[in-house]
Amino acid sequence: MVGKHCILELYDCDKSKLDDEAFLRTTITTAAKRAGATLLNLITHRFEPQGVTGLALLAESHISIHTWPETGYAAVDVFTCGDHTMPEKACQHLRDELKAMNHALRSFLRETPAAVAELERTPECTPR
């Protein structure tokens, strides 16, 4: 297994929080910690007249969020690699902090391609 990928749809969120770039930066940072991930970099952008996009680069992969305050909606993506991370905890934190009244969470495992797994098991093979 490479890691776990969670796709989170948040509905009927607190509209003011969806448009608050500083709040979202803090919330994403805490979500990464709750997942047991290591935050390497965080970039956010606030759009006019409203909406924020945030991307957290993690040592283990990423967290992204795109908000539409006018409809109370946020699209969240959390992908973490390794057995020590818990992306669902990041999703739960984001859901709770944004006060989502409704949500949909889909998660699935990312698998190691067979050819890569074979190279990892064969020490004498070197990548080209």
UniProtKB/Swiss-Prot annotation:
Enzyme class, UniProt record, top EC level: lyase
Transmembrane segments: none
Note describing how the cofactor binds: Binds 1 pyruvoyl group covalently per subunit.
Example GO BP: spermidine biosynthetic process
Record key words, sorted: Autocatalytic cleavage, Decarboxylase, Lyase, Polyamine biosynthesis, Pyruvate, S-adenosyl-L-methionine, Schiff base, Spermidine biosynthesis, Zymogen
Cofactor(s) for this UniProt protein: pyruvate
Pyruvic acid (Ser) PTM sites in chain numbering: S61
Catalytic activity: S-adenosyl-L-methionine + H(+) = S-adenosyl 3-(methylsulfanyl)propylamine + CO2
Pathway annotation: Amine and polyamine biosynthesis; S-adenosylmethioninamine biosynthesis; S-adenosylmethioninamine from S-adenosyl-L-methionine: step 1/1
Post-translational modification, as annotated: Is synthesized initially as an inactive proenzyme. Formation of the active enzyme involves a self-maturation process in which the active site pyruvoyl group is generated from an internal serine residue via an autocatalytic post-translational modification. Two non-identical subunits are generated from the proenzyme in this reaction, and the pyruvate is formed at the N-terminus of the alpha chain, which is derived from the carboxyl end of the proenzyme.
Annotated site residues (Cleavage (non-hydrolytic)) in this chain: E60, S61
Pfam family, one: AdoMet_dc
Family under the similarity heading: Belongs to the prokaryotic AdoMetDC family. Type 1 subfamily.
Subunit structure: Heterotetramer of two alpha and two beta chains arranged as a dimer of alpha/beta heterodimers.
Protein's UniProt name: S-adenosylmethionine decarboxylase proenzyme
Organism: Synechococcus sp. (strain WH7803)
